[in-house]
Swiss-Prot record:
InterPro entries: DNA_methylase_A-5, DNA_Protect_Modify, S-AdoMet-dep_Ade-MeTrfase_prd, SAM-dependent_MTases_sf, YtxK-like_N. Pfam families: N6_Mtase, YtxK_like. This is Uncharacterized protein YtxK. It comes from the Bacteria. Disulfide bonds: none annotated. The lineage of its organism: Bacteria, Bacillati, Bacillota, Bacilli, Bacillales. To type I restriction system adenine methylases. GO terms for molecular function: DNA binding; N-methyltransferase activity.
């Protein structure tokens, strides 16, 4: 049944995006952001379309749409489908969306680790279209959340903005390089699918402990440091990391940084079957920023996660997680 609802919302977004794309001669992904804003504002004037006929057709779509009554997950999933359509020609791994199954699992972890918090502040420093953040926000059980997202790509940011409005999420957006100074108060939790690769701004990297001694620094190392800096003492960070994170030439500094600044709580390897290319396979790393009343767990939660479609194996794994939480938290 949910599939039908998601499909109906997708059709509304897709039809509007195609019309706007053709009329304004812009990319589908840019048109999708405009379509999202149109549905939120419930008007078409801001589009300044050249053809009256298209304005009337969009008006008819607006009259058909009832975004105020749609479940938030329908809207998020519909946007996800439309974004995938618009990005199918973009092969850069750092511009791919975090798969739903992983987003839902990270939501489960956030709820477990932040169980005692009724109000949360959340930062995603590599927001993209916001899919991971909105997945987590939609799954927060009985918690209110103020969230912050940083994204350097203005088109992706516009899509996140359109979704935040339609999902009625309190989200502050920052259009900037996440590794430049951030004017954000420390948050309770950070979630991030780390962009992997080299950071080209050597001068900017000089401000970081985890800068390379020579040559370009790893962006994913700098993202970790920036995230820890903007987390409250005792706060948690949930990263999707490349499986080779601790094997690189720059990993010595990273290990020392972890020892000095955080407690590693969990390292969970994701099923390789999720990833098209095993070279891009990832794990989930859970850190706690050190503070006066924090201590490292007696035992780090280490696991190779089974396929998410294997329900029995996942239930067994979650039972093991519950045991770990009873002992350590």
């Amino acid at each position: 049944m949910q599939k039908d609802h998601v499909g109906a919302v997708y059709e509304l977004l897709n039809e509007a995006a195609i019309m706007i794309k053709n009329e304004l001669q812009i990319s589908y992904i840019e048109a999708l952001a405009e379509a999202g804003e149109m549905y939120f504002l419930e008007k078409t004037d801001q589009l300044k379309l050249p053809a009256d006929q298209k304005t009337k057709q969009l008006q008819a779509l607006l009259e058909k749409a009832e975004f105020g009554t749609y479940e938030h997950e329908w809207v998020r999933k519909a946007f996800q489908l439309a974004v995938l359509k618009g990005m199918k020609d973009i092969s850069h791994p750092n511009r791919q969306m975090t798969p739903d199954t992983i987003g839902l699992f990270i939501s489960y972890l956030v709820n477990k680790f932040m169980a005692d918090k009724k109000e949360l502040t959340i930062l995603d420093p590599a927001l993209g279209t916001g899919n991971l953040l909105f997945t987590v926000l939609n799954q927060l059980s009985e918690k209110t959340a103020n969230s912050f997202g940083i994204e350097i790509d203005d088109v992706l940011l516009k899509i996140a903005y359109a979704q935040a409005n339609l999902l009625k999420k309190e989200l502050e957006l920052f259009h900037q390089d996440s590794l430049e100074p951030l004017f954000i108060d420390p948050v309770d939790t950070v979630i991030c699918d780390l962009p992997v690769g080299y950071y080209p701004n050597d001068e900017g990297a000089e401000a970081f402990e985890l800068k390379a001694d020579e040559g370009h620094s790893f962006a994913h190392h700098l993202f970790i440091e920036q995230s820890v800096k903007h987390t409250k003492p005792g706060g948690y960070l949930f990263f999707m990391i490349p499986n080779h994170l601790f094997e690189s030439s720059q990993s010595g500094k990273l290990k020392q940084f972890f020892k000095d600044k955080v407690h590693i709580n969990a390292l969970l390897q994701l099923p390789k079957s999720i990833f098209k290319d095993e070279a891009h396979a990832k794990s989930i790393l859970v850190l706690q920023k050190q503070g006066e009343n924090t201590k490292a767990p007696g035992q780090i939660l280490l696991a190779n996660l089974p396929s998410f479609s294997n329900q029995k194996a996942m239930l067994d794994m979650m039972a093991q997680f519950d045991e770990w939480f009873k002992k350590e938290k």
